[in-house]
């Protein structure tokens, strides 16, 4: 049972949401009075309550989604709220659907989408993972953060070949190392207001760190938004190479670190938008002709379930006609299908851009 103080805060938060008529978040849409009453006294084994789930969305009424999972059990215990939000965000992933088993597929199917190097500036594929036996950010203790970091850094120090590299803890990081990582666009900052409000940044920078290989094409973030963000990237459009590197890294890490997995939802993450495959495959791409015809760009993107963002990711503008374009779908399909859909869409965009020239 949640304590009286928590329930009082929840009642207050619910009133605030109800009064916010211009709030468009999925939290507001699906936290009905019935659902609220059903969930407000519940508590996970690790002590998380509905307040942990909704407080970011209550504090930031301009949230798109507005909920986070404080631990793995929250997805089950608070499913009357999470399930409809997941179905809405991951279009058509119904509450009776089951996410397929992990399948990276035939990695030879992925190619260089821009062999002439005229359009794609860089390519990146990432996935998120949570370590089994640990809650997500809001419920972690400082000791757990440190324990996780030591497990992760020792696992990564065993990587060989192209993946071999160095782990840099954020704690005690020198200004020089910090600046170098910023210049390489590798350093993550303390969370934005949405993550801050979700209590995702406690004990900062304890247990946080960055690993990268010597070629700077493989990167792992430890305890940023998720326990692990595993990232493969390089300049140019060779999606095949980027994907193959990610797959071999994930398989290597998985041998040593058990990941949180849910029968129905796939791999578990802090934010419900990343569930399932957790895979985001993206390119930075120059499309000057399509940039001038945004409607056409969005139409093609929509056909292949692509998300079009500004150059520096969410909530930014396209600088010099350069877009960040990625797969939108992460649930109800395999890793292979998610990245293949993105590859097909990018090839189509390049084809149309060429025809318009």
UniProtKB/Swiss-Prot annotation:
<dbReference type="GO" id="GO:0004054">
    <property type="term" value="F:arginine kinase activity"/>
</dbReference>
<dbReference type="InterPro" id="IPR022414">
    <property type="entry name" value="ATP-guanido_PTrfase_cat"/>
</dbReference>
<feature type="domain" description="Phosphagen kinase N-terminal">
    <location>
        <begin position="9"/>
        <end position="91"/>
    </location>
</feature>
<dbReference type="InterPro" id="IPR014746">
    <property type="entry name" value="Gln_synth/guanido_kin_cat_dom"/>
</dbReference>
<feature type="domain" description="Phosphagen kinase C-terminal">
    <location>
        <begin position="119"/>
        <end position="356"/>
    </location>
</feature>
<keyword id="KW-0007">Acetylation</keyword>
<keyword id="KW-0418">Kinase</keyword>
<feature type="binding site">
    <location>
        <begin position="280"/>
        <end position="284"/>
    </location>
    <ligand>
        <name>ATP</name>
    </ligand>
</feature>
<dbReference type="GO" id="GO:0005615">
    <property type="term" value="C:extracellular space"/>
</dbReference>
<keyword id="KW-0808">Transferase</keyword>
<protein>
    <recommendedName>
        <fullName>Arginine kinase</fullName>
        <ecNumber>2.7.3.3</ecNumber>
    </recommendedName>
</protein>
<dbReference type="InterPro" id="IPR022413">
    <property type="entry name" value="ATP-guanido_PTrfase_N"/>
</dbReference>
<dbReference type="GO" id="GO:0046314">
    <property type="term" value="P:phosphocreatine biosynthetic process"/>
</dbReference>
<keyword id="KW-0067">ATP-binding</keyword>
<feature type="binding site">
    <location>
        <begin position="122"/>
        <end position="126"/>
    </location>
    <ligand>
        <name>ATP</name>
    </ligand>
</feature>
<feature type="binding site">
    <location>
        <position position="229"/>
    </location>
    <ligand>
        <name>ATP</name>
    </ligand>
</feature>
<feature type="binding site">
    <location>
        <position position="271"/>
    </location>
    <ligand>
        <name>L-arginine</name>
    </ligand>
</feature>
<feature type="binding site">
    <location>
        <position position="185"/>
    </location>
    <ligand>
        <name>ATP</name>
    </ligand>
</feature>
<keyword id="KW-0547">Nucleotide-binding</keyword>
<dbReference type="InterPro" id="IPR000749">
    <property type="entry name" value="ATP-guanido_PTrfase"/>
</dbReference>
<comment type="similarity">
    <text>Belongs to the ATP:guanido phosphotransferase family.</text>
</comment>
<feature type="binding site">
    <location>
        <position position="225"/>
    </location>
    <ligand>
        <name>L-arginine</name>
    </ligand>
</feature>
<feature type="binding site">
    <location>
        <position position="314"/>
    </location>
    <ligand>
        <name>L-arginine</name>
    </ligand>
</feature>
<dbReference type="InterPro" id="IPR036802">
    <property type="entry name" value="ATP-guanido_PTrfase_N_sf"/>
</dbReference>
<dbReference type="InterPro" id="IPR022415">
    <property type="entry name" value="ATP-guanido_PTrfase_AS"/>
</dbReference>
<dbReference type="GO" id="GO:0004111">
    <property type="term" value="F:creatine kinase activity"/>
</dbReference>
<feature type="modified residue" description="N-acetylalanine">
    <location>
        <position position="2"/>
    </location>
</feature>
<feature type="binding site">
    <location>
        <begin position="309"/>
        <end position="314"/>
    </location>
    <ligand>
        <name>ATP</name>
    </ligand>
</feature>
<dbReference type="GO" id="GO:0005524">
    <property type="term" value="F:ATP binding"/>
</dbReference>
<dbReference type="Pfam" id="PF02807">
    <property type="entry name" value="ATP-gua_PtransN"/>
</dbReference>
<feature type="binding site">
    <location>
        <begin position="64"/>
        <end position="68"/>
    </location>
    <ligand>
        <name>L-arginine</name>
    </ligand>
</feature>
<dbReference type="Pfam" id="PF00217">
    <property type="entry name" value="ATP-gua_Ptrans"/>
</dbReference>
């Amino acid at each position: 049972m949640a304590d009286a103080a928590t329930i009082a805060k929840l009642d207050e938060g619910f009133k605030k949401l109800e009064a916010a008529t211009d709030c468009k978040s999925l939290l507001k849409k699906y936290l009905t009075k019935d659902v609220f009453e059903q969930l407000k006294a519940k508590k996970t084994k690790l002590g998380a309550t509905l307040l942990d789930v909704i407080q970011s969305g209550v504090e930031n009424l301009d949230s798109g989604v507005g909920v986070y999972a404080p631990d793995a059990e929250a997805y089950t215990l608070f499913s009357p709220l999470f399930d409809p939000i997941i179905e809405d965000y991951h279009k058509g992933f119904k509450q009776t659907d089951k996410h397929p088993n992990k399948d990276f597929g035939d990695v030879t199917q992925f190619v260089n989408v821009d062999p002439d190097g005229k359009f794609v500036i860089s390519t990146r594929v990432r996935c998120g993972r949570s370590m089994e036996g640990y809650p997500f950010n809001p419920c972690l203790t400082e000791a757990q953060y440190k324990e996780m970091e030591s497990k992760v850094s020792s696992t990564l120090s065993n990587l060989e070949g192209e993946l071999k590299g160095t782990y840099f803890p954020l704690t005690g990081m020198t200004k020089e190392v910090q600046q170098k990582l910023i210049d390489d666009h590798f350093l993550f900052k303390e969370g934005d207001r949405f993550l801050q409000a979700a209590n995702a940044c406690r004990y900062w920078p304890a247990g946080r760190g960055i690993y990268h290989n010597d070629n700077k094409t493989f990167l792992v973030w430890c305890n940023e938004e998720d326990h692990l963000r595993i990232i493969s990237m390089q300049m140019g459009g060779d999606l095949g190479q980027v994907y193959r590197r990610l797959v071999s890294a994930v398989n290597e890490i998985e041998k040593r670190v058990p990941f949180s997995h849910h029968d129905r939802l796939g791999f578990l993450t802090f934010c419900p938008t990343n569930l399932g495959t957790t895979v985001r495959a993206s390119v930075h791409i120059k499309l000057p002709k399509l940039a001038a015809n945004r409607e056409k760009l969005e139409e093609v993107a929509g056909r292949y379930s692509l998300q079009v963002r500004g150059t520096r990711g969410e909530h930014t503008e396209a600088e010099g006609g350069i877009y960040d374009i990625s797969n939108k779908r992460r649930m109800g399909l395999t890793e292979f299908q998610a990245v293949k859909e993105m590859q097909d869409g990018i090839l189509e965009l390049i084809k149309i851009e060429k025809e318009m020239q």
